[in-house]
Amino acid sequence: MTPAELKRLYHIIKVQLEYGLDELLPDHQLTKAPLLMRKSLFWIKNQHPEKPLGERLRLALQELGPVWIKFGQMMSTRRDLFPPHIADPLALLQDQVAPFDGELAKQQMEKALGGPLENWFTEFDIKPLASASIAQVHTARLKDTNQEVVLKVIRPDIRPVIDSDLKLMHRMARIVAGAMPEARRLKPVEVVREYEKTLLDELDLRREAANAIQLRRNFEGSEELYVPEVFPDFSNETVMVSERIYGIQVSDIEGLEANGTNMKLLAERGVSVFFTQVFRDSFFHADMHPGNVFVKPEHPENPMWIGLDCGIVGTLNSEDKRYLAENFLAFFNRDYRRVAELHVDSGWVPADTNVDEFEFAIRIVCEPIFAKPLCEISFGHVLLNLFNTARRFNMEVQPQLVLLQKTLLYVEGLGRQLYPQLDLWETAKPFLEEWMMNQVGPQALVNSIKDRAPFWAEKLPELPELLYDSLKQGKAMNQRMDLLYQGYRQSKRQQATGKFLFGVGATLVVCSAILVDNAYEQLSMASGIAGVTFWLLSWRAYRQ
């Protein structure tokens, strides 16, 4: 490690000890190295003993800076790995840091766009509208259309900082996994690797721009979700230009109520938007925390969600969607046997899983949940309990399902914050049942034919020629198979002949040796010559 890395590592350990995070390392499971290191830093004491562990962890990550803040935010979504007293405080982490100089931001943008901003924009505000750990946002107007826009720019020199801290994270994860057998269950190395991929993806604004364009296209003309327009001509790896929006933050309940918003409809539309993204589009916004969701102030009786920051999205394939929908329906019908079978059929758990034991484990965990009224049941926590139970049966982490679970918890939390009586199951069940009918019912056949009609219309004129070519190739294939079979039979005959000749030759050579011992020299010589001759004939048969 370089001196700079050692200095940073010492600072990280010092902050962790000042917040008493060594409580996370139980003494009876530690190897000698971590114990020795802790004792060697005896002068660093817990400065916040009155605060609970989860809050101390949150404050420590906040102090360590943006890379660790985002890591904590990701940890808060992994409720399959971390208990509520750890995950809940981490969900409160705020990704807010001091802005960097606006003139420097302008220089970064001009470098990325290849010219002065005045060529394309007017009224550029040197004061940032918002600032986060990865990027900063400024406002301006498009010169050609006078439309208000926001320019998002990646912080300069952020990449070396991220690379350095990620390298330390990987080292620390390997140390923790090696020092504590119990920690291996949390898969620290895999968690850091997953975080690294997510964080590095956020450094490329082309990805976010493409995601926003796709999501906007999916909801074009919708009354439920609005995604601001992105201007790809002015967007690249480090700069993204998009439409400026004015809205009420979804967590501003007083502001929404003062605007006369239909809170029940707004909450139900949040659920509808989620299930539409997942089951209709297989492409969903996976970072829908309150900071990224606004509500249009116009037409409060017919409220519309606004989705920002599409840096993290999730996708599901058709098989995952079908299994997920069937799981939800089976769960709320309390058909735990079907839930267990679906997990095996989907490959989420090993094929040799004992279905009876798996069913019983699911029943024990989930039956108490359904003792409550349906309107009080958390859809997200049902999914969380299911995944936690499945992990005991060696279910591998499914990244797409982790993102789905996180998003569902966000949407459900927002929905019940807006309208506490929200019955998510009542809202979602008709959607799921209709989707299942469209997938496996008569309508599915109609949809399949409709989707494939252009392909068959294009191929229909070619069918006679394709049929003729197929018959012709089939005949040629039969002829080749006959020739191969004849060659195979000939080869087997030659091998049999070779084995026979070799056996005769071996017998004659043995006889020659016996005759020499009994003083029949002439017969011995004749027998030996004959044996060698048969061996040569055998070798020739094999060669052919």
Swiss-Prot record:
GO cellular component terms, semicolon-separated: plasma membrane
Function: Is probably a protein kinase regulator of UbiI activity which is involved in aerobic coenzyme Q (ubiquinone) biosynthesis.
Record bears the keyword Metal-binding: no
Name of this protein: Probable protein kinase UbiB
Domain of life (superkingdom): Bacteria
The keyword Cell membrane belongs to this UniProt entry's keyword annotation: yes
Localization in the cell: Cell inner membrane
One Gene Ontology biological process: ubiquinone biosynthetic process
A Gene Ontology molecular function term of the record: ATP binding
Top EC category: transferase
